[in-house]
Amino acid sequence: MGFMRKADFELYRDADKHYNQVLTTRDFLALGVGTIISTSIFTLPGQVAAQFAGPGVVFSYLLAALVAGFVALAYAEMSTVMPFAGSAYSWISVLFGEGFGWIAGWALLAEYFIAVAFVGSGFSANLQQLLAPLGFQLPKVLANPFGTDGGIVDIISLLVILLSAIIVFRGASDAGRISQILVVLKVAAVIAFIIVGITVIKPANYHPFIPPHNPKTGFGGFSGIWSGVSMIFLAYIGFDSIAANSAEAKNPQKTMPRGIIGSLLIAVVLFAAVTLVLVGMHPYSAYAGNAAPVGWALQQSGYSVLSEVVTAIALAGMFIALLGMVLAGSRLLYAFGRDGLLPKGLGKMNARNLPANGVWTLAIVAIVIGAFFPFAFLAQLISAGTLIAFMFVTLGIYSLRRRQGKDLPEATYKMPFYPVLPALGFIGSLFVFWGLDVQAKLYSGIWFLIGIAIYFAYGNRRKKK
């Protein structure tokens, strides 16, 4: 199969029949909300408010949600027509050709590798902070990644990624049940923060709501709000993890749109509420450099016990995110192996009809990144790779509509206001990508060069055999 040759819909559908269709709308809502409302809601709002937007950070969240919403609608339609493992990779391979599908999938693979490592490291840092008052302190060699503050391996990051892989290895239904339990706790903690935080809001902290723009620092005005969008967009990318597991959905024509759109709507409401309460409790400048603004704001307001409880539940939230990312990433690796673009072993199922090799490959790579190497400078790569995949998917809606009822099934859910909304989704994703810092775009370029080299040196050659 050449770069431009389109993949066969029937082959993909038949190849994925081995998956057990066990995931319900509730499972997808739990995975989606758990992945979206994870590390970001407890870390980003204060930093973006202090660095870019002031109280106007809520507009950054809403604008990011608007762009993500356009893309989510496209994902919902795609997943009802093609409920395949691999999500964007499989869809783009069918619509535009294998080579373009590989580029989209390679972009998402960067997201999963780095995001699993990123969340694992965040889990480690928060757990160490939570246990410090109890006198628990790891030796530096086991507390930090290699070369960071005397560290050799971040042992907690290693163990939590390993645990998430074991749970996913047991099956998607087990992961879904655990996610449902943990996501309820996390949403309850967020709501508790909102209710308590409202009682200590000082209206003066909202003035001016949109601070004047400072061209020297980039702070304030619409420019500051848009700079916040590029940083915050990372918070909304979790709905791709739902689509990546669509091969395991019960009645995907109904469960997929409900899971994707529902999880995003819940996330938007919670993000906006937390952000408004946070900047109302204390001056936005007080959150500068603060990686745990929610817990800090509660402590400073005299709610130390609730602060500890929220931090503990935040850890549960990060664990849900790990489950979602490992689930989705392993299915993407399976799809690459299924099609011969990566070693065929990744495309094999075990006796329980699970892509075990994909699960362990993802876990091992993420452990190496998160436990042994400092990776903070790669964080924006998560957004960069995902945004490129999002652009492919929104453009793919035009090809999908032309082929529905011909060589592809009719969608049971269709993106509204066609052809305007797909275009807005593409343009919005492009603008957010353009707003990323230069290093993120540079590193994403290097990642894609590596991917293209692998495709022509290995994947394309294997496909021809």
From Swiss-Prot:
* Signal peptide range: none
Q: Name the domain of life this protein comes from.
A: Bacteria
The similarity comment for this entry is: Belongs to the amino acid-polyamine-organocation (APC) superfamily.
Per UniProt, which keywords does this protein have? Answer: Amino-acid transport, Cell membrane, Membrane, Transmembrane, Transmembrane helix, Transport
What causes induction of this gene? Expression is repressed by the transcriptional regulator CodY.
| Taxonomic source organism | Lactococcus lactis subsp. cremoris (strain MG1363)
Q: What is the lineage of its organism?
A: Bacteria, Bacillati, Bacillota, Bacilli, Lactobacillales
Stated membrane topology is: Multi-pass membrane protein
InterPro entries associated with the record: AA/rel_permease1 (IPR002293)
GO cellular component assignments: plasma membrane
What's the name of the protein? Branched-chain amino acid permease BcaP
Its biological purpose = Branched-chain amino acid transport system that specifically transports branched-chain amino acids (BCAAs) (isoleucine, leucine and valine) and, to a lesser extent, methionine. Important for CodY-mediated regulation, and required for optimal growth in media containing free amino acids as the only amino acid source.
Q: Which GO terms describe its molecular function?
A: amino acid transmembrane transporter activity
Q: Where in the cell is it found?
A: Cell membrane
Deletion phenotype, per the entry, is: Deletion mutant shows a strongly reduced uptake activity of BCAAs and methionine. Deletion of the gene results in the loss of most of the BCAA uptake activity of L.lactis, and deletion of this gene together with a second BCAA permease, encoded by brnQ, further reduced the viability of the strain.
Does the record carry Magnesium as a key word?
A: no
